[in-house]
Amino acid sequence: MASPLTVDERRRWLYSLKQSPALRHTRASVLLRLLERARPVEPQPGEVICREGEPVDGVYLLRSGEWRVTAGGTVLLHLRPGMSLGVEALARGTWPVAVTAESASCALFLPRAELEAVAAVPRPGGFGGGVASRADVVTFRARGLELPPATVSLLVELVAKVMVHDFGDRVLLVRAGTKRSEGAVRGADGVFRRTVTPHAPVLPEGEDFDCVLLDGVPAPEGLTPREVWLVPPGGEPDAVGTPGAQVLPTVLLSPWRPQGSRTLLGRSLPDEDGWDEDVPPPGCRLRLDWERWVVRPGDARPLAALGLDAGTRDALSRWARAITGRRVGLALSGGGVWGFYHVHLLRRLAALDVPVDLLSSASMGSLVGAYYCGTARDGREGLDGLRRLQHRARGGHLSAAALSSVVTTQAMEWLVRGDLGDLALEELPVGFLPVTTDLTTGRCVVLEKGPLALAVRASGSAPGVWAPTLQPPARYVDGAFTSMVPVDVLLHAGADLVFSSNIFPAGHHHAARPLLPGAVGLFLSALNPLARAKDLLASGVLLLHRNGDLESARGDLRYDVGTRDQPLLGSMRFTHVDEVLDEAARDMGLEQKLLELKQAWEALRTRGSTSGGRRAA
């Protein structure tokens, strides 16, 4: 049996697949799921992999061994572990070369049919499924949670309405009953409903749906459904699901009962040559007051007629996006005052009606993310928090906190807690995932639970300048040093559309002219300790920026701020916030990227224009 893909293999082959013209615009999350389902092949020495002129059968990803590539009998090159075969040939249709195994080898094979389906039909694979022409079948159950069956039925009823309203999906809701309905009946809310008796077929003949929601009905035999588990805060599911089924744990949060952890908890990202072991499946949070609802299961009124408050409506939309594979994730880099580019970005996304379901960040990006996610609750868009952060920067409060952090980073923690209160990461409806660096292990740590203000402090403790954040045995410093733009964090968390923003500029380094002419002047100039210190700073800035660029490439869309004069010195001028916001507003490159994100979101929301009649009328 083939071993799991290492982190380095996932990254390398995701990048390789993105180079294919046919797959260039395919979402990274879909390609990652294809990689997880790739079929292992083990060619023996002398075995022919493909012949010149034959139809391309798929893409091969070599894990071990060596393959010989020839054209017209001439050896062109040898493929070695980590290299791919067939990525560029997909668009051509036939193999331009012949490939033979030189030694016993192991590879992964992605069939052409699956790759073409991904490229031709922009249909999301949900939270771990694949691309399939049939409807997505979803089951619901409570795990480790005392929840009346009527409440589960009501949640299923409401999320079905939201899927129809928000996405235009054809949704079938199937419930158990004593009498079987022959076909599916469409209600005033656009949801198709059907009642089935035990052992009766679940799906009606001759009907096509985007999603089938099973409420108290077992999945048809031979079909592996997706399972939505309703779990309590801080609790783990107390049972295993259907073998092979993809699971979406949904944490039910009450707006009236804070249940956050007081201890900062995180998970280390795996090493390059390792893989994720015992990592729970990506989940989501459902923050709503279900105990006070007056809606009942079977209510076929349109969504607008139910009188749901803004918080409930927002929570159900987030849940619907998680179930159907439509979650949008943002990865925000660090960069001091340049982080207010992120503020402009978030404001524009709100104006463009692009949702944000997951947000990963480092350093200053975590401060912006905290003020956004900490106030994007109960139907609010998070813009109030961004205004408060802008006010803090303009009034000099951020500069004072940054200066105090030379002694202790508690100053930044106090500032955030004073503005946002005692919120915890696991209480936020928007999945907020700041990263930090643990110097005791050298690993990047994704902070998932604990005080929000403390997480911001740990993510932005720039080493050598600011004091570290000590959470024994961990010694946390700035997350930008191990993950400047945390795109991988979003992919692991279940984001389906990823936008990354690298706003830490690369700098222009102007070399000083030698004071003396000739070789002596050059020698003295190279010996200058002040010039060497400037070289060190410029190299550090360039290294951080380039690392951010490499991570950004694994997302679906990305923005890079480019170069600026004295970026490191300028990043500490927090009182210049209005100048940075004005510059961001004038940046047509950023605006173009945001419009592309809007277009990508609309394609994801409506499943594209090639739906083949699957959309609701």
Where are these regions (language model features)?
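Cyclic nucleotide-binding regulatory domains
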Residues: 22, 43-104
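Extreme N-terminal, non-catalytic leader segments
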Residues: 106, 111-139, 299-326
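Helix-rich "cap/lid" substructures immediately adjacent to catalytic or cofactor-binding pockets
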Residues: 307-359, 616
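Inter-motif core of Ras-like GTPase G domains
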Residues: 219-235, 240-249
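P-loop/Walker-type NTP enzyme "switch/lid" segment
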Residues: 141-145, 170-211, 216-222, 435, ...
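Cyclic nucleotide-binding regulatory module and flanking cytosolic helices
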Residues: 1-45, 89-91, 114-124
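Non-catalytic peripheral regions of patatin-like phospholipases
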Residues: 254-303, 307-313, 328, 377-419, ...
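Glycine-rich phosphate-binding P-loop
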Residues: 136-165
